[in-house]
Amino acid sequence: MHYLDNLLLNTDSYKASHWLQYPPGTDASFFYVESRGGVYDQTAFFGLQSILKEAINRPVTHADIDDAKALLAAHGEPFNEAGWRDIVDRLGGQLPIRIRAVPEGCVVPTHNVLMTIESTDAKAFWVPSYLETLLLRVWYPVTVATVSWQVKQIVRDFLQRTSDDPEGQLPFKLHDFGARGVSSLGSAALGGAAHLVNFLGTDTLSALLLARAHYHTPVAGYSIPAAEHSTITSWGREREVDAYRNMLTQFARPGAIVAVVSDSYDIYRAIREHWGTTLREEIIASGATVVIRPDSGDPVDVVEQCLLLLDEAFGHQVNGKGYKVLNHVRVIQGDGINPQSLRAILERITAAGYAADNVAFGMGGALLQKVDRDTQKFALKCSAVRVDGAWIDVYKDPITDQGKQSKRGRLTLLRDRATGQYRSALLDEVATHAGDSDDALVTVWENGQMLREWTLEQVRAHADAARL
């Protein structure tokens, strides 16, 4: 077993003491997860299925308990040994909880319930709280999926305005370059898979492995041959054109796409003299599309200038919407890309008369790493407990920050059948609104069993159906 695989130690230290802190007579608890606002006013839900399969799919064992007991005693925390041993002996080590969640891929306005966790055994009412640490990590894939989804809406808008084939172009317009800039292999896999909810382009191989293992998708994303600086500069400055010619020799075939970073020395000279003059006829004869990648400078200015220079060399066609589409070549910008700079680039080239077909984008750290739990203000809170047989509301309402006010009661998420709009509601309200709304939450996990799974294809369909 891996040294991090003990579920009992996949929590915050203080959680080990919480079973002693509830009111006498407590025998059930109810928790929920929401985005309390943030950078974006909608979130694309994704990643819970993977977290559940990774973190709680294995029953708790007495060996786990022995390990946790020894470590927590040395660490300075009390430990509910009797409670955990009862779960192993009486329940076979399966966690007595029910988890309900919005279907993965659904895009839900912030300030709404996204998932709930409730106890199913009176003696183990404290288990949902113990799992907060690992379950709230869903903030990460949800936030990455949300950033990626928001970018997709930006790109879709410009494609619809300037392209003859917006839906055909869209899936490969944002490429994941983030594997090397993320905090861990696991984060690369989970965050990379979250991006693949919205796009098909990625260089994060671990994301393909996660999608294959957890979302029933043999190959979730695609890439193309591409140069890096070392494969160009190793030829030497004087042989730069030979490095580019080698890329054509190795990869340029009819219908193929090959990307070549071209700013190792002078991006503008590379386009004018090498790509646009010396190699021009070779590119045309190859039948391939060569994608030039600038990797420095101001992204907005550099992309526009590259398009202008490539247009001088290769010319363009004017599409049905009156925008220019370059012949034989494209540009991909992967340096300095975030939702704001991406929009600025598209605004600039649109104003210059170029279709969004001409450019693609890569995002690395801004996609997988420059996010945190506060990007969308994620929280997992207790909203109800049952004490002496009666449910009571549980909530916080700090006078120093009204934004941290939590919801109260046993909750769910309703979706209006006519408008598709979501709103959080009490479970008791579901029957009242049965005529006009559906309960949007689905039981995905109960008492050690995964009850509902989504394929990545289904997740993508949910996300693609939503709009800003």
UniProtKB/Swiss-Prot annotation:
Pathway(s) annotated for this protein in UniProt: Cofactor biosynthesis; NAD(+) biosynthesis; nicotinamide D-ribonucleotide from 5-phospho-alpha-D-ribose 1-diphosphate and nicotinamide: step 1/1
EC number: 2.4.2.12
Annotated effect of mutating residue 229 to K/R: Loss of activity
Binding-site residues for diphosphate, renumbered to this chain: 180, 229, 293
Positions annotated to bind beta-nicotinamide D-ribonucleotide: 203, 335, 373
Result, substituting residue 229 to A: Retains some level of ATPase activity but it completely loses the ability to produce nicotinamide mononucleotide from nicotinamide
Keyword entries, A-Z: Glycosyltransferase, Phosphoprotein, Pyridine nucleotide biosynthesis, Transferase
PTM notes: Phosphorylation at His-229 plays a crucial role in enhancing the substrate affinity and is important for maintaining enzymatic activity.
One of the GO BP terms on file: NAD biosynthetic process
Molecular function terms from GO: nicotinamide phosphoribosyltransferase activity
Known regulation of activity: ATP-dependent autophosphorylation plays a vital role in nicotinamide binding and enzyme activation. Activity is inhibited by FK866.
This protein's domain notes: Both protomers contribute to the formation of the active site. Contains two distinct NAM binding sites, one NAM molecule binds in the catalytic site and the other binds in a lateral tunnel that connects the active site. The binding of NAM molecules in these two sites is positively cooperative. The NAM binding tunnel is important for both catalysis and inhibitor binding.
Family: Belongs to the NAPRTase family.
Oligomeric and partner information: Homodimer. The dimeric structure consists of two protomers arranged head to tail, with domain A on one protomer interacting with domain B on the other protomer.
Function as written in the Swiss-Prot or TrEMBL entry: Catalyzes the condensation of nicotinamide with 5-phosphoribosyl-1-pyrophosphate to yield nicotinamide mononucleotide, an intermediate in the biosynthesis of NAD. Plays an important role in the biosynthesis of NAD via the nicotinamide (NAM) salvage pathway. Is also capable of hydrolyzing ATP and shows ATP-dependent autophosphorylation activity.
NCBIfam families, per database record: PRK09198.1
Family matches, as PANTHER family: NICOTINAMIDE PHOSPHORIBOSYLTRANSFERASE
Name under which the protein is recorded: Nicotinamide phosphoribosyltransferase
Protein source organism: Xanthomonas campestris pv. campestris (strain 8004)
